[in-house]
């Protein structure tokens, strides 16, 4: 049995096919979703989406949004998404280093919040290239 996964951004369809299982980063932690999962709607955090397809795990960097799960269909609506295989490792590492430097020199509440969000996005992109597990 499989799940139909759709990952959508405002500009494009990033993924639209059947999968065996996913692990989704939500605002309250990671959740694993298998076929016949209970219906749920949840906020999606900036983080990694892990997709199991043909007994292999693929990764995708998600930049926050919402997900709806029900009837073996998963719809993930996010601000932006990138498949781990599409991310340039060198560019992602440079972006991470720049984001870390910006956090250190940020002044004022707004700059600190924006710098920390940029750092979280940069870390997520690097993690999508080099998954821990």
From Swiss-Prot:
Main location: plastid
Highest taxon of source: Eukaryota
One GO CC term on file: proton-transporting ATP synthase complex
GO MF annotation: an example: ATP binding
Keyword hit for Coiled coil: no
Keywords: ATP synthesis, CF(1), Chloroplast, Hydrogen ion transport, Ion transport, Membrane, Plastid, Thylakoid, Transport
Membrane topology: Peripheral membrane protein
Localization per record: Plastid, Chloroplast thylakoid membrane
Pfam families documented for this protein: ATP-synt_DE, ATP-synt_DE_N
Keyword Membrane: yes
InterPro entries to which the protein is assigned, alphabetical: ATP_synth_F1_dsu/esu, ATP_synth_F1_dsu/esu_N, ATP_synth_F1_esu_C, ATPsynth_dsu/esu_N
Function: Produces ATP from ADP in the presence of a proton gradient across the membrane.
Cited PANTHER family: ATP SYNTHASE DELTA/EPSILON CHAIN (PTHR13822), ATP SYNTHASE EPSILON CHAIN, CHLOROPLASTIC (PTHR13822:SF10)
Alphabetized HAMAP family for the sequence: ATP_synth_epsil_bac
Family designation: Belongs to the ATPase epsilon chain family.
NCBIfam families: ATP_synt_epsi
Subunit structure: F-type ATPases have 2 components, CF(1) - the catalytic core - and CF(0) - the membrane proton channel. CF(1) has five subunits: alpha(3), beta(3), gamma(1), delta(1), epsilon(1). CF(0) has three main subunits: a, b and c.
Protein name: ATP synthase epsilon chain, chloroplastic
Provenance organism: Nicotiana tomentosiformis
Source organism phylogeny: Eukaryota, Viridiplantae, Streptophyta, Embryophyta, Tracheophyta
